[in-house]
């Protein structure tokens, strides 16, 4: 099997940017990575995810329980694996993914009491990696961002238009719980944590993409060598 490396973090943490920069830098070093991302909005397999995020099943993330929501995302990943990148993985290719099963761990744990997190994670990984047959990641890069900074970045993405946010992005309490769940998962599962928040003139802000990427590449070069 090939290598599967995941970029994980809250909304607005720069996962897509860092995954893309990592692919560019890895190309320059002689690797041939395939970049994938989830949800796969260009595929019909993401239909239930779109319905969930647009509020068709309820206007709050908690209106769909952790197990049901997880299956929406898992089926999307299964379809992507079977149609797009499974062969690359089986032929020892290098896959760089913006989100993965790890996102279910973060965003669905946040719907449950902390005492139930371990049981949920056990179910989730058994379901996706064993029952569905998806490959487990070889490494996870967790981009840690202060929730307030994350919210500002999301607002900038939509130019202040709140109507463009999905039900998760609109729910600040849910995002705070997701941050707590992400930190727990990072510790428990051995993710490589990169702190992306810094303070400039007394205000919390995100580090530059290039600054974060230098730390990302130092880690990737170590695990790929």
Each language-model region and where it sits:
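Pre-Walker A (Motif I) flank of P-loop NTPase domains
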Residues: 1-4
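Hydrophobic anchor at the beta1->P-loop junction of P-loop NTPases
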Residues: 7
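P-loop (Walker A) phosphate-binding loop of NTP-binding proteins
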Residues: 10
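Conserved lysine of the Walker
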Residues: 15
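Hydrophobic positions on the alpha1 helix immediately C-terminal to the Walker A/P-loop
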Residues: 18
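NTP-dependent small-molecule kinase module
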Residues: 23, 148-225
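ATP-dependent small-molecule kinase phosphotransfer cores
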Residues: 31-126, 130-132
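A glycine- and Lys/Arg-enriched "phosphate-lid" helix/loop adjacent to the NTP-binding pocket
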Residues: 102-180
């Amino acid at each position: 099997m090939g290598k599967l490396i995941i970029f994980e973090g809250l909304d607005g943490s720069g996962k897509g940017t860092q995954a893309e920069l990592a692919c560019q830098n890895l190309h320059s070093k002689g690797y041939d990575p395939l970049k994938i991302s989830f949800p796969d909005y260009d595929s019909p397999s993401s239909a239930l995810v779109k319905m969930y995020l647009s509020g068709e099943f309820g206007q709050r993330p908690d209106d769909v329980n952790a197990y049901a929501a997880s299956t929406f995302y898992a089926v999307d990943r299964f379809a992507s694996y079977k149609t797009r990148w499974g062969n690359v993985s089986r032929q020892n290719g290098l896959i760089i993914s913006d989100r993965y099963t790890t996102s279910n761990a973060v965003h669905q744990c946040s719907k449950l009491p902390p005492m139930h997190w371990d049981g949920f994670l056990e179910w989730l990984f058994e379901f996706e990696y064993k029952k569905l047959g998806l490959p487990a990641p070889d490494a996870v890069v967790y981009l840690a961002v202060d929730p307030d900074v994350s919210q500002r970045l999301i607002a900038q993405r939509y130019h202040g238009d709140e109507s463009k946010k999905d039900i998760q992005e609109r729910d600040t309490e849910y995002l705070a719980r997701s941050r707590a769940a992400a930190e727990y998962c990072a510790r428990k599962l051995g993710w490589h944590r990169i702190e992306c928040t810094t303070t400039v003139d007394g205000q919390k802000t995100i580090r530059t993409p290039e600054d974060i990427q230098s730390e990302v590449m130092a880690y990737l070069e170590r695990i790929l060598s």
